[in-house]
Design a protein with these regions (language model features):
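Gly-rich Lys/Arg/Thr-decorated short loops/hinges at beta-loop-alpha junctions or inter-strand turns
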Residues: 11-19, 50-57, 90-104, 197-202, ...
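Active-site cavity-forming subdomains of large catalytic enzyme subunits
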Residues: 106-279
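Short low-complexity stretches enriched in small and charged residues
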Residues: 9-13, 86, 111-112, 246
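Intrinsic-disorder-associated, low-complexity terminal segments enriched in Asp/Asn/His/Tyr and depleted
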Residues: 2-7
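Long, structured ligand/cofactor-binding scaffold of large enzymes
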Residues: 42-157
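N-terminal amphipathic/basic leader segments beginning at the initiator methionine
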Residues: 9-44, 71, 79
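A short N-terminal beta->alpha junction/helix N-cap motif
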Residues: 18, 22, 40, 57-65, ...
Length: 279
């Protein structure tokens, strides 16, 4: 029993899990050799394999804190009897892609994210999945993959950016977008625009506005794939790492109880999510 949260340390029968195909029996000796090459022990290989996927990259601040949070997820998995297998997938960040040909890549990136996460989990026979995402299309992409795979899964949002300060007021990238319009109409000088853009985004995290990322973060809780209250904490806060670790612990409980995304993402759950978005 975990002393803090009451999680039950479960023993798993690997013969009933997908990862048996890559880790059990004499004919899987080569597979096990690969795992030993990565530092895993015989005990680790005998445990359930849990995919930990993030959309970490340096395209925008939305995703740069995700690798840190992934390490906390892995700690939660290991402390509850699993062996985490971390991997990354792509993301196209609308904040950088907007205003030029790059935006043609945005929506299709959602499908690529879903496909790539699904292929990785299926190809390596992972038993469960924790997904961490930080920008517009990556959140629905990972949640889509979870429902398609239908292995025990937990989603966690990477968190929103902190506001900047300009002329004594909180500002976000929304203010910079509006400032571009003011500048084009002659209501703001180039010097003022430069000062604003330098301070508007002071940290890691998704766009500080009610755009797709923060909206889908709310949806992730409403449909039941994310832990309650996990969407609200900004990306730089250490509390995000606590939610990440708890997500790693929770996915092990879902695996033990055989609770899968399609048990959670019901029509009622989707109606609940729609209500949240429309409010």
């Amino acid at each position: 029993m975990d002393n803090n949260k009451g999680y039950i340390m479960a023993k798993f029968n690997k013969k009933k899990l997908p990862s048996r195909h890559t880790s059990l029996g004499a004919d899987r000796a080569p597979h096990r050799s690969f795992y030993y090459a990565m530092g895993e022990t015989e005990k680790d290989v005998a445990k359930p394999f849990i995919g930990v996927v993030s959309t970490w990259n340096e395209a925008a601040p939305c995703n740069i804190a995700l690798m840190r949070q992934a390490q906390s997820v892995k700690k939660g998995v290991r402390s509850n009897g699993g062996t985490p297998r971390e991997f990354c997938t792509i993301t196209v960040t609308d904040g950088i892609a907007m205003g030029h040909e790059g935006m043609k890549s945005s929506l299709i990136s959602r499908e690529v994210i879903a496909d790539s996460a699904e292929l990785t989990v299926r190809g390596h026979c992972y038993d469960a999945l924790v997904g961490i995402a930080g920008c517009d299309k990556s959140l629905p992409g990972l949640m889509m993959s979870m429902v398609r795979l239908n292995v025990p899964s937990v989603f966690i949002y990477g968190g929103s950016i902190l506001p900047g300060r300009y002329k004594g007021k909180d500002v976000t990238v929304v203010d910079v977008f509006e400032a571009v319009g003011k500048h084009s109409s002659g209501k703001m000088s180039s010097a003022e625009l430069r000062k604003l853009e330098l301070v508007a985004c002071p940290s890691a995290g998704a766009c500080g506005g009610q755009f797709t990322a923060n909206t889908m973060a709310c949806v992730s809780e409403a449909i039941g794939l994310a832990l309650p209250y996990s969407a609200g904490t900004p990306a730089p806060y250490e509390e995000r790492d606590k939610y990440a670790k708890e997500s790693g612990k929770m996915v092990m409980q879902l695996l033990k109880k055989r609770i899968k995304p399609r048990d959670i993402v019901t029509r009622k759950a989707l109606e609940n999510a729609a209500t949240i978005v429309l409010q």
